[in-house]
Amino acid sequence: MLSLQTIAKMAVATNTYSKCHYPILKVFGLWWKNNTLNGPIKICNHCNNIMVGEYPMCYNHGMSLDIALIRAVKERNMSLVQLFTEWGGNIDYGALCANTPSMQRLCESLGAKPPKGRMYMDTLIHFSDTLNDNDLIRGYEIFDDNSVLDCVNLIRLKIMLTLKARISLMEQLDQIALKQLLQRYWYAMAVQHNLTIAIHYFDNHIPNIKPFSLRCALYFNDPFKIHDACRTVNMDPNEMMNIACQQDLNFQSIYYCYLLGADINQAMLMSLKYGHLSNMWFCIDLGADAFKEAGVLAGKKNRRVLQYILGLNIFKRELIPPCKDPDPYQIQILLKNYILKNVSTVFTYYCQ
């Protein structure tokens, strides 16, 4: 049951006050001051999220009680930890990121289960498996700069995260710090499952994420996010095409890179190298004609039937009308239900 003082603080925090009331709010414990915040604590009447100062911290509706509690624990702000716990924040999340013995004891005194053994890894996996915005954000906040992960097998953790994210999070296992790896992991999971609130949150809270956001957009075939990322990220079109070809059926990503000037013959060969034949046929529809090189590569990969087909002089090229500019709306309309035309040509040839 909530205490009378807790209920009173909640009632006060749901209202907006003028600056002349700020000294009273500070005395009342409804003030948050740190390196980035300095303002009154408010509760949104509609979603029960926490806001600080004149404007929300994140997106349109502030931050959840759990996120506020996690941040207060990391800042070792004991009064706010107690306040947010009394208001309904999950103190177990706080215990997972408590960075001092005194803060750990406070969390346990407020009802947290002492974290032990695999609980940290199990929680990390749970947050990424539930596939909703709030859990991805909670996972990011709990494990960002969390020293407990210094004790885990880093190579095993990096491999596991890369497999779950589906997209390569790093070039080599030793080339990226764990903090950056985890940031990329949460972002990739959000993009992969189109969790727009989490994407917006990470865009605003993870520094220098834009280059990786472009890689995600290319890999997961999202022309709108590609278009947005290209406004701030300068990447060579052929490098972009290489990323796009790493996932099959990435027609919209490949077409966007093609319009930027990427080499479509190289895209055809890269698609075959990765074993993504739908991408290869799409490149042929766009005008790729590296049939001799592709035939040699198919032979090396022991694809004898494909090698023979690529040697036939039956293919039509430039079957897709080019857009004047890489407009994601036009690209999506043009390719959403695209049928590979030269695959039909092959079937027609053999059915004659």
Curated annotation (Swiss-Prot):
Q: Does the keyword Nucleus apply?
A: no
Q: InterPro entries, from UniProt?
A: ASFV_MGF360
The biological process GO terms on file are: taxis
Q: Which residues form a coiled coil?
A: none
Q: Does the keyword RNA-binding apply?
A: no
Provide this UniProt record's keywords sorted from A to Z. Early protein
Instruction: Supply the induction statement.
Output: Expressed in the early phase of the viral replicative cycle.
Its annotated function is as follows:
Plays a role in virus cell tropism, and may be required for efficient virus replication in macrophages.
Regarding protein family, the annotation reads: Belongs to the asfivirus MGF 360 family.
* The protein, known as: Protein MGF 360-16R
Give the lineage: Viruses, Varidnaviria, Bamfordvirae, Nucleocytoviricota, Pokkesviricetes
